[in-house]
C-alpha cells in the first residue's frame, strides 16, 4: 500500500520522466495575484505563463502545490472534520503545458499514470467532457477504449473552465472513480451525482480560447494544459480507503492528537481529532509561509482556523495547550517534502502555544456564555443573531466557531440577525479585499512593457548613465512631452536608478535631455519597468530623446550602508534568537533602517546588546561585500537566506559579507551573512561606519521591529545621547559614570519627600494637628472646610482620617490644586441611613457651578469649575443636613 509521500513521488517522477520540469510549490500567499487570499490551486503560480505575460525556460511543468481553502470564494472550513473529503489544507498534484502538448498529450499521460503506475483497474474509471468537445471524447475512445456510456457529456460550467470574466478559458475533462454499487450515488450529470459512489479524482483543463468583455471568444495562439488532482483523494483511493482521514498521513496526525489529549482516536471524539489533524496542517504551513495570527486579512483567517482547532482540543478535555505539541509529528510526516516546515518548526510551535494560551480563557468564558444563552431558549431553538454577535464582539468568537459549537448540540444561529449586527465590519472587510482600483494605471504600464520590454538596470555598477526616453506618462495616459513645472513619470531603456523593492527605497536624482531637465523624486518598478517619478524643472522632456541620468550619490551611499547593515542585523538576530528568525519586512532609507522579523516576544536588553555588538564587530572587520549570480537552487544549497514573499527568476543575486573566525581566504571558513538580494550594497562592511540600535518594538502579532542608524547618523545619535548624559551629570553634580546611581538616589529622595509633603498637607488641612471643632446640626456633627494645595487624589485619605477623628458625623472638604477644584465628602457608618456622602457632594458641586459627583454612601467625590463660591457650598451642605430628620 503506497503512502501519501509515495503517491506524491510517483506522480512527480512520472511527469519528470516525460519531460516535465519539477517546480517546487509556491507559497500559500500568492506572489502574482492580489485577488486571492491564499494559493488554492496548482495553476496560480503559472498564471502569467498561461496569459503570455511571462516566459520561462521550460514548457512542461509538474508540481505538488500546497493549497489552503478557508476564507473568500473557496471556503471549506465549516465542513472540515465532518465529511470524508473536506480540508482547509490539501496538496494539488498537477501537470502543465505552456504551448507544448495539448489534449492528445494530456489525456494519454493521465490514463497511463492512473492505470499503469498507480495500477487502477480500467473498468473503475469513467470520464466527463464538455458537451461540444468531440476532440476530447474521440481521444478518450482511442487512448482508453472507453465506450460512449463511460464518456459523459456535460453541458454546464462544471466542464468549462474560465480564469475570470475575461482571459484564457476552455473545456475540461474530469476523471471519476467508481466505488461500486454498494455505495449510493449516480454518475456525474445524473440526479444522484452528489452521492459518494462516483468520485472525481482528476481534472484536465484545455486552455484553447480567450474570452472578451463583449462575450465573444477566439482561439488562443498558445494552447495550454492545466491539470489538478488532490493528493489526499487519490491517496485514499490507492490505499483502499473511502475517507481521506483514514490515509496514513492523516492517521498519523490523528493518533498524535489522540496521544496528546489521552482520547480515543476512534471514540466519541473522532470528529475533534479530524479537525485538529487538518487544522494543524493549514496553520503550520501558513505560519511557515509568513502569515501570523491577527485581526484582519490572512492573519484573521489563520486565527479562525487555529481557534477552531483549539476549541475541538478543549472538547477532548485538554486543559493545557496541545497544538504546539503536535508539530513534530507533522514535520515527521511532511518535512521531507516541504523543508520549510522544519526550518520554521520553532516559530510554529511558539506561535501556536502563545495563541492557544491566550485563547484558553476566552474560550472558557465564551462557551459558558453560549451555554447561558442556550439555557434561556426553548428546547431546540436557534441562537439569536444578537447573542452570536456578542460572542464575536466581546469574546472574539467568529461566527463559524459559534456555529461549530452549536452544530454538536443540534442548534444553529440566526444568521440574519448576526449579519445585521456585523454589517459595518463586513463592509469594511469587503472594501479591504475589493482591489487597489489601479486598473487604468496597470494597463498603461502593461502596454509600455509590451512595447518596449523591461528596463535594463545599470545601478549595480554605476550611478551615472545615458539612456533613451521611451515613454512619458501623466494621469495614467501616455504623452509626447512634459513641460516645466509638470509632474511626469519617465521610462527609459536603461537606468542607474534603483526602483523601490525588497525594502529598499527608490533612488532620487536628475534626468537631463537636450531640451530640459527633471528632478527625480522617487523610482518605482512594476513588471520589469522602472518608473522615474519626476518634476520637470527646466524646459521640456520629450519622448524619444536621449537622456543623461544621475543618481543622488550621497543619498544612495546612505541607503547602501543601511541595506548592508540589515543583512548583518538579520544574521546577528538569527544567531542570538534562533533559526526561526526570518525577515518579514524592512525599510532601507537614507536616514534610517527598519527591520521586521519573526519572533514572538520582546528582546531582552542583553540580547539587544549582543546583536548590536556583533553587527559592529563585522563592520570593523571591513570584509568585502561580494555578489554572485547563480540559480535559486544553488543559492539555497549554499544556505542563502531568501527574502520572504519575494519572487525569484532563473538567476538570483547572492550577497555575502563577513568572515567567521578562521574563514579568511584559503582557510575554508564560512561566510557570516549570505542572502538572496536584488538591492545595492557597500563595497566593504567598513563602509557602513557604525551601527546603533534605537528601538525594538512589536510590529504585529509574532513580529518584532528593530529600528537603527548607521554611519554619520549613528555617530550623531551617540553624540546626542552622550551630550544629554553629560548635561544630566552636570545637573545632578555627578560624574557621567555615576549618573545612574545618582539619579536613582534622587528618585528615592523625591519619593520620600513627596510622602512627607503629603503628610504635611493632610495635617495642615486638618488644622495643623489641632483638634477639629465640628459644628453640630440636627444632631449630626459636621466638619466642612476649604483647603488649598491638596489634589483630588489626596482627598480620599484625608476625609477618611477626619472621619476617624470625628467618631460620628459628616465631613465635607473643598480643595483646589493645579487649577482643579474637587469636593470630597464622608459619612460615618452609623449615619449613612440618614444622609449620604453622595448627596453632600452633589449639593456642594451644584453650589459651585458643577454637575454630579458620585461614590458610596460613606464616601464620595466630585469636581467643580472653581471654589469661588466655597462659602455658599458649605452653607448649602449645612442646610441639607439641617433638613434631615
UniProtKB/Swiss-Prot annotation:
Top EC class, one word: ligase
Comment on protein domains: Consists of three domains; the N-terminal catalytic domain, the editing domain and the C-terminal C-Ala domain. The editing domain removes incorrectly charged amino acids, while the C-Ala domain, along with tRNA(Ala), serves as a bridge to cooperatively bring together the editing and aminoacylation centers thus stimulating deacylation of misacylated tRNAs.
EC numbers: 6.1.1.7
Sequence similarity: Belongs to the class-II aminoacyl-tRNA synthetase family.
Cofactor(s) recorded in Swiss-Prot or TrEMBL: Zn(2+)
Reaction equation(s) it catalyzes: tRNA(Ala) + L-alanine + ATP = L-alanyl-tRNA(Ala) + AMP + diphosphate
Protein's GO biological process: alanyl-tRNA aminoacylation; negative regulation of DNA-templated transcription
Keyword RNA-binding among record annotations: yes
Alphabetically ordered keywords of this record: Aminoacyl-tRNA synthetase, ATP-binding, Cytoplasm, Ligase, Metal-binding, Nucleotide-binding, Protein biosynthesis, RNA-binding, tRNA-binding, Zinc
Protein residues bound to Zn(2+): 563, 567, 677, 681
HAMAP family: Ala_tRNA_synth_B
SMART domains registered for this protein in UniProt: tRNA_SAD
GO cellular component: cytosol
Chain positions covered by the region annotation Disordered: 848-868
Protein name, as recorded: Alanine--tRNA ligase
One MF term in the entry's GO annotations: ATP binding
Function: Catalyzes the attachment of alanine to tRNA(Ala) in a two-step reaction: alanine is first activated by ATP to form Ala-AMP and then transferred to the acceptor end of tRNA(Ala). Also edits incorrectly charged Ser-tRNA(Ala) and Gly-tRNA(Ala) via its editing domain.
Compartments where located: Cytoplasm
Main location: cytoplasm
Cofactor descriptive note: Binds 1 zinc ion per subunit.
Organism domain of life: Bacteria
